[in-house]
Amino acid sequence: MTKVRFAPSPTGKLHVGNVRTAIFNYLFARKAGGTFVLRIDDTDVERSTKAYEDGIRADLTWLGISWDETFKQSDRFDRYEAAAETLKAKGLLYPCYETGEDLDRKRRLQMANGRPPVYDRAALDLTDAEKAGFEAEGRKPHWRFKLSGNPVQWDDMVRGHVSIETSSLSDPILIREDGSFLYTLPSVLDDIESEITHIIRGEDHTTNSGAQIEIFEALGGKAPIFGHQALLVGADGGKLSKRTGSLGIADLRDVDGLEPMAIMSLLARIGTSDPVEAFADVEGILEGFDLGKLSRSPARFDDEELKRVNAKLLHAMPYDVAQPKLAVLGADKGEAVWEAVRPNLETLADAKAWAVLIDGPVTPVIEEPDYAAAAAQHLPAGELDGDSWSVWTNALKEATGRKGKQLFMPLRLMLTGEARGPEMAVLLPLIGRDKVLKRLAGEAA
């Protein structure tokens, strides 16, 4: 059975970059009828917080991304220790005593001599006496995994055939001087023991995957099938990194007031061969989802495109779907008002502002008192309905000789105080005769 995982670190908030990876994994699992695992990568005890973890879970839930299994790496340190001992016993995990300054000096020297800054494996030649000497100085070792030096190859679901020359890589550090684990070993062991079948992640992990495949094999596991998607860039092709704060899922929800399906719709489609569409539910996205459609070129994320998708969703949203959301905002004025204001919405919160045009109080903008008086005089008798606007404006056209913008714009300003907004033919009966007459008389109503 297909089994994938999304493995965020609770050291920060979810943003469009990493949540796109969550979306791809979620859609891939659902399309295959498989299992989606949420793994919390909290081995960095100093920086990981419960607040960030709770935020990650809340953001995913709000987006409609549900998980079938979940666990935290901090509950599995004993398993990582055992795996490290296995690698040590095989001679594949070796201690190194260089300080950060030592390694920087080596890298600078290599680069000055035109060589790639690859770790020279000097630690493999240390004698027991030399190691003891370092220990006596108070140095603690960090531990590196010994790569084979052979090419590692796989067929990537996005990038096609990939070959990584491990001879050109530094042996990766798996354990820090303080005994804490870096990302690599816990991730591999978790993937083995969780029986993950596919790993879908950013292309910045491609080289790292070459090293990880050797660790999979060293621990007696079989490497999953990999798919490395291109990273997100800004609309101008520049990096998003400086803006990840403003592109956090929580901010897009709480500050910008965007709909979850707008974010899902955009992130699932940019960087693919399919056009961006506004999907009302995940089923719509699933129908055409295929990792094979992903481009190897960076996907451009455009804030304005996200807003357009959000607006399209709202313009097509039925009242029964909108009603609970409107109620939370204190903007539920009934189906008739929703139908009137819906075509003008960019965010759901806009509904509250547009509803004020109906409920009032509105301060009318009257630049031509004589025209206001004529408008009041020719307002159709009786209860206003869907035909009243047409009847009214035709009568005014006949009486004043006005037409086009000169006829309509002053009426909009007098009745709404705004130069733009929902259709007046729809608004007029909702405002009602009494408030219309008061506003035409210059009263706030």
Swiss-Prot record:
Segments carrying motif 'HIGH' region: 8-18
Protein origin, superkingdom: Bacteria
EC number(s) on file: 6.1.1.17
GO biological process: glutamyl-tRNA aminoacylation
Pfam family, one: Anticodon_2
GO CC entries: cytoplasm
Motif ('KMSKS' region): 239-243
GO molecular function, one term: tRNA binding
Keywords: Aminoacyl-tRNA synthetase, ATP-binding, Cytoplasm, Ligase, Nucleotide-binding, Protein biosynthesis
Top-rank EC class of the record's enzyme: ligase
Subcellular location(s) per record: Cytoplasm
Family annotation (InterPro entries): aa-tRNA-synth_I_cd-bd, aa-tRNA-synth_I_codon-bd_sub2, aa-tRNA-synth_I_CS, aa_tRNA-synth_I_cd-bd_sf, Glu-tRNA-ligase_bac/mito, Glu/Gln-tRNA-synth, Glu/Gln-tRNA-synth_Ib_cat-dom, GluQ/Sye
Catalytic reaction(s) noted: tRNA(Glu) + L-glutamate + ATP = L-glutamyl-tRNA(Glu) + AMP + diphosphate
Binding site for ATP: K242
Quaternary structure and partners: Monomer.
Described function: Catalyzes the attachment of glutamate to tRNA(Glu) in a two-step reaction: glutamate is first activated by ATP to form Glu-AMP and then transferred to the acceptor end of tRNA(Glu).
Alphabetized PANTHER family for the sequence: GLUTAMATE--TRNA LIGASE, GLUTAMATE--TRNA LIGASE, MITOCHONDRIAL-RELATED
Family the entry assigns: Belongs to the class-I aminoacyl-tRNA synthetase family. Glutamate--tRNA ligase type 1 subfamily.
Protein name stated in the entry: Glutamate--tRNA ligase 1
Lineage of the organism: Bacteria, Pseudomonadati, Pseudomonadota, Alphaproteobacteria, Maricaulales
GN (gene name): gltX1
